[in-house]
Amino acid sequence: MDISTITDAFGDVMLMQPSAGVFVAAVLAAILLGMSAFASGSEIAFFSLSPTDVAELEDEKTDADKKIQMLRDDSERTLATILITNNFVNVTIIMLLNYVFAGIVEFGPKAYWLQFLIITVILTFLLLLFGEIMPKVYARQDSLKFCRRCVGGILFARKLFWPLETILLKSGILAEKIIQKENHVLSVEDRKS
């Protein structure tokens, strides 16, 4: 790729006046990015509590501590809640930001590679940085404090996604049984050989 190809690509990009829908989509994407950060931080916070934190939770000093303990006791469902929430939010963010870029920037035929670069690579990087990496680093600093702040949101997401969680957990149990059965059959056949 030479410099003229790059120059032609940037010359084939036009900025457009954003509509009200584009502004709404951008605001929603920003709010959802916060929700993605919340879910990512929660994943680390709930599953990286130190033994000291766990001991403090067992004293159940606050209502939040009782709720955190309840979520930890059903850790598979809690993890399913967090993962479903995070995936749902991240997919929605990508769709909204695609709409935002389509409403602001028009890429001509010479700039299709630039469109791919901006929408796929840069948006993915920003989503990973602000929705995954930074929240996890922040949550790891004081996991118990983060858990206490987010336990209400996790319980709300748990109620919201209960049917999906149940399907996910049941299918996981079924897959585990199938794999165990296949491993048993293989080990019996290995013994005969």
Model region roles, listed by residue range:
Residues 1-191:
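Membrane-embedded alpha-helical segments of inner-membrane proteins
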